[in-house]
């Protein structure tokens, strides 16, 4: 198999291999890297996944992208080390399941990508004898997952930006207590401000002497590992070649794009439900063909999804033959008919989010947090317009309910237990910087962090 190449969604940069795409984060033309072609699995190959543990499925999926870049035995070891935690699938009712992606080091689905990315980054930097600074904007969980995964990785410095007033206490403490090679910066603004500052830094001529990369879902290294758990879920809940419905809480659309990648690789998918909160730019676009960013983004209980312009829409538009630039301008419309056939999207209010937590607890004794509740309610909206039939469905729960103790307590009357993987961080002293949502100040901060002499 030849080495797979990745192209920019803006189409003005040369195609590169996975190593180059991963280390760069964003293409020089400000587009996002995406596979030129999707490697495929045969139905027989996918059928064998039912007998395999998670780390082995991860190896088989990711090896399709790392051929010629990472030796197979090295990749297998990386997968075994990265995925040493369970991936529970709980039955809600007949053929409808809840997949909890909250068992990793920071109790978030972001651990699945961050743990693998850190190992890939570490290997590539050692091979090249290089140093790198990773800039990451977080709306809640990415920062903690990236900070923990890259903590004390030689050659890597991590700088995380988060909206000061829009993350929960536990989300904040999971990233502000690490120190060493990790710095966190509270921004007096929205997540979109944080993300815009990171993107500007990549394109800033004054910072070209600083080797920068990103661990946000603009980095292809985040996206590819997130395709694995869709293969895993299907292998546990579906018969051979049986299509699955996935309902996914969607903010920056990296999680949802993992399902799209899996489908493009051959996984039978009946429908992808992209459930959003009050930041409803995508369902409106899907309905009307007109895209308008939400600025500023709207606050919701599902705070990790408070994204007014999802970066990964550029990749989704590209899959369907269109082109969206980094500002959200659509230069070529995608095939909307095909997109509507494959994807259903709906906006869930905070009131319905609260109702979903209560409904699932009262009826099924399963505890959701706000993001999982958005996915549950999105699934309900889809089944109101299309029949599920006998197809299996998987609702994605992206964070541990203990990250949202106040919200959960208001609904069910008690606070969820804090998992052991979170307890230690919550007891440590915090250390973070704070600044206005001002790019010039952020540039000065970066220059001070990276003196040239």
What is each stretch, according to the model?
Residues 1-453:
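PLP-dependent amino-acid enzyme catalytic core
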């Amino acid at each position: 198999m030849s080495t797979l190449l990745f192209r920019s969604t803006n189409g003005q940069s040369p195609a590169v291999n996975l190593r180059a795409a991963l280390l760069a984060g964003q293409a020089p033309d400000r587009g996002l890297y995406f596979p030129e072609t999707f490697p495929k699995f045969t139905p027989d190959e996918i059928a064998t996944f039912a007998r395999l543990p998670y780390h082995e499925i991860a190896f088989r999926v990711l090896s399709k992208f790392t051929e010629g870049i990472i030796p197979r035995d090295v990749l297998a070891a990386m997968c075994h080390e990265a995925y040493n935690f369970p991936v529970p699938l709980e039955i809600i009712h007949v053929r409808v399941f809840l997949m909890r992606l909250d068992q990793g080091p920071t109790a978030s689905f972001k651990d699945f990508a961050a743990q693998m990315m850190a190992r890939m980054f570490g290997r590539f930097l050692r091979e090249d004898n290089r140093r790198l600074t990773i800039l990451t904007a977080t709306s809640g969980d990415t920062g903690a997952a990236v900070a923990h995964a890259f903590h004390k990785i030689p050659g890597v410095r991590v700088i995380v930006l988060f909206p000061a007033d829009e993350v929960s206490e536990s989300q904040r403490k999971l990233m502000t207590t690490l120190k060493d090679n990790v710095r966190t910066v509270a921004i007096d603004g929205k997540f979109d401000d944080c993300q815009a500052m990171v993107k500007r830094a990549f394109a800033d001529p004054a910072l070209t002497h600083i080797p920068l990369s990103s661990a946000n879902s603009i980095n292809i290294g985040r996206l590819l590992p997130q395709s694995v758990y869709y293969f895993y879920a299907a292998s546990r809940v579906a018969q051979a070649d049986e299509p699955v419905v996935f309902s996914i809480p969607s903010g920056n659309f990296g999680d949802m794009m993992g399902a799209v990648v899996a489908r493009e690789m051959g996984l039978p998918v009946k429908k992808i439900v992209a459930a959003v909160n009050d930041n409803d730019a995508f369902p409106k676009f899907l309905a009307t063909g007109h895209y308008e960013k939400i600025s500023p983004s709207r606050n919701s209980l599902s705070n990790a999804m408070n994204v007014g312009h999802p970066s990964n829409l550029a990749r989704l538009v590209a899959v369907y033959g269109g082109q969206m630039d980094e500002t959200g301008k659509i230069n070529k419309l995608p095939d909307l008919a095909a997109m509507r056939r494959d994807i259903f999207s709906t906006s869930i209010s905070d009131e319905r989010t609260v109702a979903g937590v209560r409904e699932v607890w009262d009826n099924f004794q399963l505890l959701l947090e706000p993001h999982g509740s958005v996915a549950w309610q999105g699934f309900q909206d889809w089944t109101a317009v299309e029949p599920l039939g006998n197809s299996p469905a998987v609702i994605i729960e992206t964070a541990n309910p203990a990250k949202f103790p106040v919200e959960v307590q208001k609904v069910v009357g008690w606070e969820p237990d804090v998992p052991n993987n979170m307890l230690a961080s919550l007891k440590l002293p915090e250390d973070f910087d704070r600044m206005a949502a001002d790019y010039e100040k952020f540039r000065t901060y970066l220059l001070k962090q990276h003196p040239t002499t």
